[in-house]
A protein has these predicted regions:
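Mid-domain Rossmann-like dinucleotide-binding core that forms the NAD(H)/NADP(H) cofactor-binding site
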Residues: 82, 138-219, 224
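Glycine-rich beta-strand-centered segment in the early N-terminal region that forms part
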Residues: 19-35, 48-94, 135-138
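Glycine-rich phosphate-binding loop and adjacent beta-alpha segment
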Residues: 244-307, 345-346
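C-terminal hydrophobic helical "lid"/dimerization subdomain
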Residues: 1, 248-252, 294-346
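NAD(P)H dinucleotide-binding glycine-rich loop of Rossmann-like/cofactor-binding domains
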Residues: 90-172
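Short, surface-exposed secondary-structure boundary micro-motifs
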Residues: 33-34, 71, 87, 101, ...
Length: 346
């Protein structure tokens, strides 16, 4: 198969011919029809993820067709249209038994713990636990865009944030994660204030339903700006970027008993941000994480997509080839363009 491979961290990846994968007894091989390019892939490429063993094939936002099936798989057949969460569970540990596959003790992450989907084929483990069937009405590019950013935002807004209609949601960072959160919060009737330093990103946030926007590069104090707009602070606030400044602002702009959801990865030098803990204590704030979403929770999200309440295809910015994905991957830290980039030609 053709795949993108890097043999050293931060060294330019290259296209290479590799043997086609064979399925594990409990897994399947998926023919990749579309694959998102995500900032998490960039973090892996520069060496921020200790699970990665070199040489490595990145990629974790995928959709495709089942190509081969392991002997112990019960629920899937060759030809099934599928996607998969970027964090998969083993199905047998205490967390999986409790339904929390996204924090599995032995989690499987294509593109991190194993070779990923910047390739023609990818091996997916524990298929009966982790695969998600795709409706025929959902195209592969849109389905691939769900795999990391959209589902993580869905879990952040809906499951972790318990957001309800009429509440104020602040979204710090309007990349793929943040724009997904804007769309999801708007769909359930919340009022959204989007914060970014890019007017292009903020314009897209408004198109996707943001009630108000704040350009963090142009206001003197982001927290005060959000407090003014929301008349007292957000009920739920997300750091969708993963930076000490956005994390601090997201916690600080909450109203009493509000919830901060950390969605953006905090790695390397950003892994220990300052937290206004006195405010957390005095105002009884909650700090939560969102790390993917279980396969069994996809149904609620897919139902909203099929009903038209969510339109994730609006987030797709560019469709590129596997060859073009190398440059796109290496430039993910530059936050160029708007929306989600998806590989659709292999």
């Amino acid at each position: 198969m053709k795949a993108v491979v890097f043999e050293q961290f931060s060294a330019p990846p290259h296209i290479q011919q590799l043997p086609d994968p064979a399925p594990e007894s409990h897994g399947v091989v998926v023919k990749v029809m579309a694959n998102g390019v995500c900032r998490s892939d960039w973090h892996g490429w520069v060496g921020h993820d200790t699970d990665i063993q070199l040489p490595h094939v990145p990629g974790h936002e995928l959709a495709g067709v089942v190509e081969a099936v392991g002997k112990d798989v019960k629920q899937w057949r060759i030809g099934d249209r599928v996607t998969v969460p970027f964090v998969g569970g083993c199905g047998s540990c205490p967390e999986c038994h409790a339904g929390n596959h996204q924090v599995c003790d032995s989690q499987f992450q294509p593109g991190f713990t194993h070779w990923g989907s910047f390739a023609e084929y990818v091996s997916i483990h524990y298929a009966d636990v982790n695969l998600v069937a795709l409706p025929e009405t959902l195209d592969f590019a849109t389905a691939a865009s769900l795999g990391c950013r959209f589902v993580t935002s869905f879990r952040a807004v809906v499951d972790q944030g318990q957001t309800s209609a009429g509440q104020w949601v602040a979204v710090h960072g309007c990349g793929g994660v943040g724009l997904s959160a804007v769309m999801i919060a708007n769909a359930i009737g919340a009022n959204v204030v989007a914060i970014d330093i890019s007017e292009k990103a903020l314009a897209l946030a408004r198109q996707l339903g943001a009630t108000a926007t704040v350009n963090a590069a142009k206001v003197a104090n982001v927290v005060e700006a959000v407090a003014d707009i929301t008349r007292g602070g957000a009920h739920v606030s997300l750091d969708a970027l993963g930076h000490p400044t956005t994390c601090f602002n997201s916690i600080s702009n909450l109203r009493k008993r509000g919830k901060h959801i950390q969605v953006g990865l905090m790695l390397a030098e950003n892994s220990t941000p300052a937290i206004p803990m006195s405010q957390v204590i005095a105002n009884e704030l909650e700090i939560l994480g969102s790390h993917g979403m279980q396969a069994h929770r996809y149904g609620a999200m897919l139902a909203m997509i099929q009903s038209g309440k969510l339109a994730p295809e609006q987030l797709i910015g560019r469709r590129i080839t596997l060859e073009q994905s190398i440059e796109a991957l290496m430039n993910m830290d530059k936050f160029e363009g708007a929306g989600v980039t998806v590989v659709t030609a292999f």
